[in-house]
Amino acid sequence: MSRIETDSLGPVEVPEDAYWGAQTQRSLINFAIGKERMPLAVLHALALIKKAAARVNDRNGDLPADIARLIEQAADEVLDGQHDDQFPLVVWQTGSGTQSNMNVNEVIAGRANELAGKGRGGKAPVHPNDHVNRSQSSNDCFPTAMHIAAAQAVHEKLLPAVTELSSGLAELSMRHHKLVKTGRTHMMDATPITFGQEVSAFVAQLDYAQRAIRATLPAVCELAQGGTAVGTGLNAPQGFAEAIAAELAALSGLPFITAPNKFAALAGHEPLTSLAGALKTLAVALMKIANDLRLLGSGPRAGLAEVRLPANEPGSSIMPGKVNPTQCEALSMLACQVLGNDAAIGFAASQGHLQLNVFKPVIIHNLLQSIELLADGCRNFQQHCVAGIEPDAEQMAAHLERGLMLVTALNPHIGYDKAAEIAKKAYSEGTTLREAALALKYLTNEQFDQWVRPENMLAPGGKG
């Protein structure tokens, strides 16, 4: 069953049970591309904008109070997720996001008209353009929704997840702050370090990434709304930009303000590319953490085997008993995806030709995917990997005992050249450092015990 809806191009058949109208239906017909739906976070942000605009237009006397109330009621239902099935459009549409903006306008108008007792859909008493989109353009609504959705996702999902992982790693670091092991540079044995110190680097990297993300948020909270079609604010009343930003801040609890330059807010997306860059920083840190833990857990008998990673599942369909570092692999893969998304976002953001960037949907699609992947990845990695990590103290001690770089502690006492000779002799003859040093008669057994003490090699000023 269907009904007829109309737009400036004429009549269109729309499913009878749909709240959307002609423009949404045309997009479904003309852009049957891929399966990537416009993110619900963007559509909910658009609904929030419609609610805020209705309130501001009502206060300004630009919208009848009864129409404003109907719009707000319908928008609240959208925000509550009651009509998520009414947003079928894909990312691959007009680059301004106009079709998704109209999808939201039509759904809110269609539901508002039903609430008014006039049946589902239609344009009376609530019109999708004249009322729901009053004082707005897709060109300022969509970038505003992009910023709202990104800011909400970072605040509500990403930052708590990064904090959870960072806290878990900090606890692991503190628990093993005295456990001495072999450090490694260039993938080769180096001077000693504690396992706690090693893990503390992970914590610091995550903290830096988190600070980088937070630093981008003030610009993300600057909104394009009020710029309308090209940034001039045509058809928006004086003060509308400031009023709707304040309304959106009150509704969301986030510090949204009006963007100081609406022309840049429509044509450029530097705040979002900055956020994407900070997400890349986090992805790079996560890749390093995952790779290090994967290396330290390699084995169990023919690798480093210095840490035991939790076994989440059997690791092989052919090798019985094999367990793989699957959490590390999943985290590494999502980090790769985030790096790729950053590249796509950067290219799309560079396409702001003249007064409007028309690559907006692909920017926000990739950005929100990165935020979601990083948030889910951090939380999952903490719960299913980090929380169950146990170092193998015996293996660490064995590697430390066999290591040759403890010879570095002898540099201040016998000089670099003699210390290097000891290490070379021990390596070539398969002996210990002690045996090589005594054979060369460069020091006594007592001096070796006094000077080669790993626990004294862990901080500035430390020496044997």
Curated annotation (Swiss-Prot):
Domain of life: Bacteria
Compartment(s) where it occurs, according to its Swiss-Prot or TrEMBL record: Cytoplasm
Class in the EC hierarchy, top level: lyase
Catalysed reaction, written as an equation: (S)-malate = fumarate + H2O
Gene3D superfamilies (UniProt xref): Fumarase/aspartase (C-terminal domain) (1.10.40.30), Fumarase/aspartase (Central domain) (1.20.200.10), Fumarase/aspartase (N-terminal domain) (1.10.275.10)
Binding site for substrate: 96-98, 127-130, 137-139, 185, 317, 322-324
UniProt pathway: Carbohydrate metabolism; tricarboxylic acid cycle; (S)-malate from fumarate: step 1/1
GO biological process assignments: fumarate metabolic process; malate metabolic process; tricarboxylic acid cycle
Ranges in a coiled coil: none
Keywords: Cytoplasm, Lyase, Tricarboxylic acid cycle
Gene Ontology MF terms in the entry: fumarate hydratase activity
EC number assigned by the record: 4.2.1.2
Residues under site feature: Important for catalytic activity: 329
Annotated InterPro entries: Fum_hydII, Fumarase/histidase_N, Fumarase_C_C, Fumarate_lyase_CS, Fumarate_lyase_fam, Fumarate_lyase_N, L-Aspartase-like
The keyword Chloroplast is assigned to this record: no
Main location class: cytoplasm
Any Gene Ontology CC annotation: cytoplasm
Main function: Involved in the TCA cycle. Catalyzes the stereospecific interconversion of fumarate to L-malate.
Further remark: There are 2 substrate-binding sites: the catalytic A site, and the non-catalytic B site that may play a role in the transfer of substrate or product between the active site and the solvent. Alternatively, the B site may bind allosteric effectors.
Similarity comment: Belongs to the class-II fumarase/aspartase family. Fumarase subfamily.
PANTHER family named in the record: ASPARTATEAMMONIA/ARGININOSUCCINATE/ADENYLOSUCCINATE LYASE (PTHR11444), FUMARATE HYDRATASE, MITOCHONDRIAL (PTHR11444:SF1)
Summary of subunit composition and partner proteins: Homotetramer.
The protein's name in its UniProt record: Fumarate hydratase class II
Species of origin: Pseudomonas putida (strain ATCC 47054 / DSM 6125 / CFBP 8728 / NCIMB 11950 / KT2440)
